[in-house]
Curated annotation (Swiss-Prot):
Motif 'HIGH' region, chain ranges: 44-54
EC number: 6.1.1.4
Compartments, as annotated in UniProt: Cytoplasm
Lineage of the organism: Bacteria, Pseudomonadati, Campylobacterota, Epsilonproteobacteria, Campylobacterales
Protein name as catalogued: Leucine--tRNA ligase
Length: 821
């Protein structure tokens, strides 16, 4: 290697990127007998530019993929683009450009950016979810799910984003705002299609146990809470005669669900959600005065965020229920804190033992009756006591502990036919209808004769029309002059297409399985079974924790649905999950609005992709937040220059030199030990901890140790190994130097030599009467007599003139001398 050569990152990186892609070095092999690793980072939305969060995500995945390739695994490491979605329509309005053109121009640009970072993605399996072929199979799944009863249509109160003019699933509402645009969400009644995810609620919950130790505990807990399983008693509260008559006999009562049936004697009111059917009936009746109706309507008009932020509020509805055990009248209120979509939208309120009920009762002067004695035997009347204890003031269950009391009440209700034991879930079916253009059309036809009819599969894909006008007002497909008009696939009569498109989370709920299918079969089938059975499930999935109850839950649901439809084999899509932390600058998440964005292109142009990758993986463990640091980027660049300069001193070799370790001097032995320590660290990092920063630090220490000695063979061996260890992290410079020195023969599985960890000498402490007085170095195989003699010599001034009563040698650690006098 020329002594005057300089590290030219741009030249080297362009060269190797062309070689890798020309040779197809990142394509998975078709040999399904090989051990495999499927490494997948969450694919990006094609917004136009990648950001540092992408760089971090894909640097982690790429390091893993490269490590496993050179360690004899067949590796699938694909990338694609989650390319449907609202931003394309917003761009169409703002820039007067078609969403399709905007999207695919962005994809082309982002592909170049990803390539410029040297990521080892499969070219042949790259896809965009807006491709018609992808839409075809997604529509096919929809039809099969419809036929299996896993899709249904209904009108319901939905989350509506006024800004994006579309419906949102519960999971897409964050603190009362749209997850995408951040604007407030309101409630509207709207017809739409729903995936029956609740049919899989129990399995989704139970299978989380199989992910323990493989997924972050926080993600598992978030999904458990979102699914929200609770068991209790469902029973009917009956209206008293006067209230029933006032409602015109339309209702005799309604169902209530409680997880604390033991507190039933403490009920002082019943609370309904503002959307409850009884409340709606009262709004159109003469029972309530105009003031009460106006207040209820004001609550209805509040967004979920406003209701949660508000003080407890409500309206007495001028009707009463009858207590199922005492037959006493119980007032019925509408309350702003009751959710319409949990249980039946009605609760029995027990103020003494539920804090929300307590706050409401305190505000409106409703009775607060204690029916559970705390275990410590005294009440705190300033708040609700929700703890378990002993039932009191409850004739049927006085003296029973809470668990026994709950069981006794449930048995009483079931025996008398008053109610039943049920399990409820907070999880709600997934509303997938979106009133936008740039999405996968729902393959349904509305026929005046046949009703709702799924499209014939041979007509798929139902493609989007190109000749649309995006104004931001209403649904472009519904306004299209011809696209929606068709023939009924069942009777041939004139019919109308469904003009809603699918939630874009549908696309990201199965893309991982599409990647796992041999791309040569993509035209003929959704999944090639042989290929999918080999590659699935994903061995390592990488992405942000913000997807814990959106994408990750939906993907698990889709995996189970596709399994039950016969497409897939596994119960879970992702065997292991790594959630990387955010990239911060000045302590805040990078964003254009904060003016603290670092453009990856700027870093690549100035320092090179390897510097960017090295900094990203060295600055912090992947699970932690990463604080951008310009001086640390400079430091990463300096290290790569040191690596380049070291290469000028290395002799060319295609094999590791044979070294007699025993014949080496102290510095040479130390250098070999540091190199093999780094090799050990590499195996630990890639297979267990993902703490790439510790591996990089170990390589830096090893390079320093090599520089501190001048044995050519030790240098050659050490550099041979260090380039191997760094290749997954800084692949361009590692390949360039390896080709020059070792013809890339070092990029293979390396064995650890245990002999280098055997120390020739050991350090021993010497204590006199328990106090440390000295430390000395001695041959590791020295006899005990030699050890004791040397120890006594090292503390001569502490034992001079004194009698040694006892000599204690703890091998390899210390010598303790007990003296007197």
């Amino acid at each position: 290697m020329a002594q005057n050569s300089k590290y030219e990152a741009a030249k080297i990186e362009k060269k190797w990127q062309e070689i890798w892609h020309k040779n197809g070095e990142f394509e998975p092999k078709d040999d399904y007998t090989l051990p495999k690793k499927y490494i997948l980072s969450m694919f990006p939305y094609p917004s136009g530019r990648i950001h540092m969060g992408h760089v971090r995500n894909y640097s982690i995945g790429d390091a893993l993929a490269r490590y496993y390739r050179k360690n004899c695994f067949n590796v699938l490491h694909p990338i694609g683009f989650d390319s449907f979605g609202m931003p394309a329509e917003n761009a169409a309005i703002k820039h007067k450009i078609h969403p399709k053109k905007w999207t695919y121009e962005n994809i082309d640009y982002m592909k170049k950016e990803l390539s410029s970072l040297g990521f080892s993605f499969s070219d042949r399996r790259m896809l965009a979810t807006s491709d018609p072929l992808y839409t075809k199979w997604e529509q096919s799944f929809f039809i099969k799910m419809f036929e299996k009863g896993l899709v249904y249509r209904k009108s319901a109160i939905v989350n509506w984003c006024e800004h994006d003019q579309t419906v949102l699933a519960n999971e897409q509402v964050e603190d009362g705002c749209c997850w995408r645009c951040g604007n407030e969400v309101v409630q509207r009644e709207f017809p739409g299609y729903y995936f029956k995810i609740t049919q899989y609620a129990e399995e989704l919950l139970n299978d989380l146990k199989t992910l323990e130790g493989k997924w972050p505990n926080q993600v598992i807990a978030m999904q458990e809470n979102w699914i929200g399983k609770s068991s209790g008693l469902e029973f009917k509260f009956y209206l008293d005669d006067a209230s029933s008559r006032a409602l015109g006999g339309k209702f005799d009562g309604f169902e209530v669900f409680t997880t604390r049936p033991d507190t039933i004697y403490g009920v002082s009111y019943v609370a309904l959600a503002p959307e409850h059917k009884v409340v709606r009936a009262l709004l159109s009746s003469e029972i309530l005065d105009d003031t009460k109706k106006a207040k209820i309507k004001s609550i209805l008009n509040q967004s979920p965020r406003e209701r949660q932020a508000s003080d407890k509020d409500g309206v007495f509805l001028d009707i009463y229920m009858l207590h199922p055990l005492t037959n006493e009248p119980v007032p019925v209120w509408v309350a702003n804190f009751i959710l319409a979509d949990y249980g039946s939208g009605a609760i029995m309120a027990v103020p003494a033992h539920d804090q929300r009920d307590y706050e409401f009762a305190s505000k409106f002067g409703l009775p607060i009756k204690q029916v559970v004695m705390p275990k410590e035997g005294k009440f705190d009347t300033s708040k609700a006591n929700a703890e378990y204890g002993i039932s009191i003031n409850s004739p049927l269950i006085n003296g029973l502990e809470t668990k026994q009391a709950k069981q006794a009440i449930i048995e009483k209700f079931e025996k008398d036919g008053l109610g039943k034991r049920i399990t409820n879930y907070k999880l709600r079916d997934w509303g997938i209808s979106r009133q936008r253009y740039w999405g996968a059309p729902i393959p349904i036809v509305h026929c005046p004769n046949c009703g709702v009819v799924p499209e014939n599969e041979q007509n798929l894909p139902i493609a989007l029309p190109d000749d649309v006008v995006i104004t931001g007002e209403g649904n472009p497909l519904d306004k299209h002059p011809t696209w929606k008009y068709t023939k009924c696939p069942k009777c041939g009569h004139d019919a109308v297409r469904e003009t809603d498109t699918m939630d874009t989370f549908v696309e990201s709920s199965w893309y991982f399985a599409r990647f796992a299918s041999d791309e040569k079969t993509w035209q003929q089938t959704a999944f090639d079974k042989k290929s999918v059975d080999y590659w699935m499930s994903v061995d390592q999935y990488i992405g942000g924790i913000e997807h814990a109850i959106l994408h990750l839950l939906y993907a698990r649901f889709f995996q189970k649905v596709l399994r039950d439809l016969g497409y897939l084999r596994d119960d879970e899509p992702f065997s292991n999950l790594l959630t990387q932390g955010m990239v911060l600058k000045d302590g805040k998440k990078m964003s254009k609005s904060k003016g603290n964005v670092v453009d990856p292109d700027d870093i690549i142009n100035r320092y090179g992709a390897d510097t960017a990758r090295l900094f990203i993986l060295f600055a912090a463990p992947p699970q932690k937040e990463l604080e951008w640091n310009d001086s640390a980027v400079e430091g990463a660049y300096r290290f790569l220059n040191r690596l380049w300069d070291k290469a000028k001193t290395i002799k060319k070799s295609e094999i590791l030199p044979a070294i007699e370790h025993a014949n080496l001097n102290k510095d040479e032995k130390y250098a070999r030990m540091k190199v093999y320590e780094a090799l050990k660290k590499s195996n630990e990092v890639f297979n267990e901890t993902f703490a790439f920063n510790t591996l990089i630090a170990a390589c830096m220490e090893a390079l320093n140790a090599l520089n501190a000695q001048d044995n050519d063979d030790v240098n050659t061996e050490g550099f041979f190994i260090i380039l191997n260890l760094l290749e997954p992290i800084v692949p361009h410079i590692a390949n360039e130097l390896s080709e020059e020195l070792f013809r890339r023969k070092n990029f293979t599985k390396l064995e650890i030599l245990e002999e280098v960890f055997v120390k020739d000498t050991i350090n021993l402490a010497v204590t006199v009467n328990g106090k440390k007085r000295a430390e000395f170095e001695i041959s590791a195989d020295a006899s005990e007599a030699d050890v004791l003699q040397t120890a006594k010599a090292s503390v001569a001034k502490w034992i001079e003139g004194k009698e040694i009563i006892k000599e204690i040698y703890i091998k390899g650690k210390l010598v303790n001398l007990v003296v007197k006098g």
